[in-house]
């Protein structure tokens, strides 16, 4: 029986550097190989993933690095938020950055290729540095005004990808679990070509609560701002792919 190493996504944390969040929470490893602040030409040296081979008891970095899309040096507490979402098809890993139009695809965790995955509801999105010394609530408010990509999902039943895009909103509620901002879902086929995009209203869905099933994409309606909200029920609406109207 062939074994494969566990793959870990690397998430940046200002206070301690890098943290590995594995698929199995039983294994947690920490390291600080890249300190703050970073230079704009250092990003292509920073790995996106680490791996753990439990048979060989070996930890290491993959050779898949961040793309060179950060155009300014970080200064003191003016830093980038390199948030990513990723999914794995069984053959390729697909990475989506929150502040970039394109997605990146790799089949060997070393080389990557960019594909356009821009929402036509948003302007072009590029990484924006943030001043972490200003008021936290203002930071959350300012981020709500920025176009932003959320999570990326792979639908193995229909061989498509769903990329969530959040619309700018001037009324973000800090620490709320009930986002009221509108969002869209960009649909890409197995060749990473955009085949459609659907916009959803705010105050209706909890876009961060979703999953893929045999019948379609399920998105939660458990949003307190939804007039039909019932705290005693967990409700998901199933969305299916429809052909384009001619």
Language model region names:
Residues 22-44, 163-180, 222-236:
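Short, conserved, GDST-rich strand-edge loop motifs in beta-rich repeat architectures
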Residues 4-22, 26, 76-89, 144-157, ...:
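Structural signature of eukaryotic scaffold interfaces centered on beta-propeller domains
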Residues 39-57, 101-104, 176-193, 232-245:
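Beta-propeller blade signature
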Residues 1-54:
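Long, acidic/polar, low-complexity amphipathic helices and coiled-coil-like
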Residues 19, 28, 93, 161-163, ...:
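Hydrophobic beta-strand positions that form the internal "hydrophobic ladder"
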Residues 38-107:
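Loop-centered beta-sheet repeat module
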Residues 143-188:
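Loop/turn-rich, solvent-exposed surfaces of beta-rich toroidal or solenoidal domains
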Residues 1-6, 58-79, 113-144, 199-204, ...:
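Surface-exposed loop and turn segments in beta-propeller and other repeat-based domains
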């Amino acid at each position: 029986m062939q074994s494969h190493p566990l793959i870990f996504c690397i998430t940046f944390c200002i206070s301690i550097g890098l943290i590995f969040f594995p698929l199995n929470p039983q294994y947690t490893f920490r390291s600080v190989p890249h300190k703050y602040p970073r230079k704009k030409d250092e990003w292509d040296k920073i790995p996106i993933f680490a791996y753990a081979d439990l048979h060989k008891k070996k930890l290491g970095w993959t050779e898949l690095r961040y793309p060179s899309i950060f155009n300014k040096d970080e200064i003191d507490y003016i830093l980038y938020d390199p948030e990513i979402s990723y999914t794995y098809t069984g053959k390729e890993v697909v990475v989506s950055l929150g502040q970039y139009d394109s997605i990146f695809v790799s089949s060997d965790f070393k080389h990557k290729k960019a594909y356009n995955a821009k929402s036509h509801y948003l302007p072009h999105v590029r990484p924006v540095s943030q001043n972490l010394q200003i008021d936290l609530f203002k930071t959350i408010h300012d981020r709500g005004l920025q176009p932003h990509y959320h999570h990326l999902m792979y639908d193995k039943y229909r061989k498509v990808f769903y990329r969530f895009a959040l619309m700018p909103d001037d009324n973000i509620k800090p620490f709320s679990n009930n986002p009221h901002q509108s969002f869209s879902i960009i649909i890409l086929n197995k060749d990473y070509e955009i085949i459609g995009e659907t916009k959803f209203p705010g105050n209706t869905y909890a876009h961060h609560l979703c999953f893929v099933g045999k019948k379609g994409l399920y998105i939660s309606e458990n949003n307190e701002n939804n007039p039909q909200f019932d705290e005693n029920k967990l409700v998901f609406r199933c969305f299916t792919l429809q052909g384009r109207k001619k």
